[in-house]
């Protein structure tokens, strides 16, 4: 089966997959061609029969989800946006930048005049290079929604000239840093109508759900902790939300089709799991539906039969797990400088699997690298699982689990491992040699993982809420 996959920069890739292939088979081939290991940030989109934008479920067959397979037309898109400093590969960062440019052009990201001026200069430097009055073009009108006056134009030109000499990679990184500070960065938009048939834009993002009018002016904001349950029925999605008075209210959103409603339900559940949870629970991973044939087979043959089974969600890792997985994968592939520094652009045709292949030829080097990797894993295992900076030196009582430092433990009301209530925190001394943590394991080893994102602290109430979101 032939798949035409359009990248965010409008380049079309031809991907050949088996007729019974799942969505992840196609995505993995695309990312392999691009040299991208951070696959979990991306997804494949297609257009439904009514023009709705739908995510291909990567765990289900492509042929069961799309209407037209001659050829299969898909779009490579960023599904989960993270902070720029958490992106380990230059290729990944470039695709993030191209996707953000498209969102800016569509008006999905709003900003003030000063931000629009700075971003206009950065986009011009990335696209046209150093300032040239004959070639420079600016996006100010698209970014700010108004025509610039001469003073504004002069300010943009001055900012553009100040960027002279900066590489494309450095400028793209700065642009992503600016965009990541905007209100709707990483928000996925769904068009729906409320109970009064008023057209709304429903934005599902890392912090919660934004309900906006047609012009993206905010009507209401719902954070994940106050969502009791999210359900889908036909073309409708229902959100049961706790108000400040502790009463519950049910919000109704009517979408254009059943698949569009399923897309909104998926977005709420998967986005919550990716950004707000420590790991993806089985309640999400194993939720599925069956067609009629599969339902009959499960009744008369075996309840666990895979015939006709379609998974509801395709998320496999949370943001923390993606970062850790990608870092280890890059290190195991022999890449030393995973965090490409701004100003040093990685060639687009460089494959991670071929990085430093000459440096790992001899058996002694391989053995040394394995020992370094084991030592690095030991060091990381002794770090707090929440902040990943301090050593583990606290035990939760009465359960006895030891997974974090005293500073993080003092902020938790329940154990993150067993969810039992914490009565008090006991300071402990792990039976390890302190000098081990200070060993230098060579230049080729990555630094201990220091996450730039704030760890989410789940209380007992928060945990029960997150479980309810996954009900269908």
UniProtKB/Swiss-Prot annotation:
It is found in: Cytoplasm, Cytosol. Its EC number is 2.3.2.27. Keywords: Cytoplasm, Developmental protein, Gastrulation, Metal-binding, Transferase, Ubl conjugation pathway, Zinc, Zinc-finger. The keyword Zinc applies. Ubiquitous. It comes from the Eukaryota. Interacts with anxa5. E3 ubiquitin-protein ligase that mediates ubiquitination and subsequent proteasomal degradation of myosin regulatory light chain (MRLC). Regulates cell movements during gastrulation by acting downstream of fz7 to antagonize the frizzled-signaling pathway. This is E3 ubiquitin-protein ligase MYLIP-A. It comes from Danio rerio (Zebrafish).
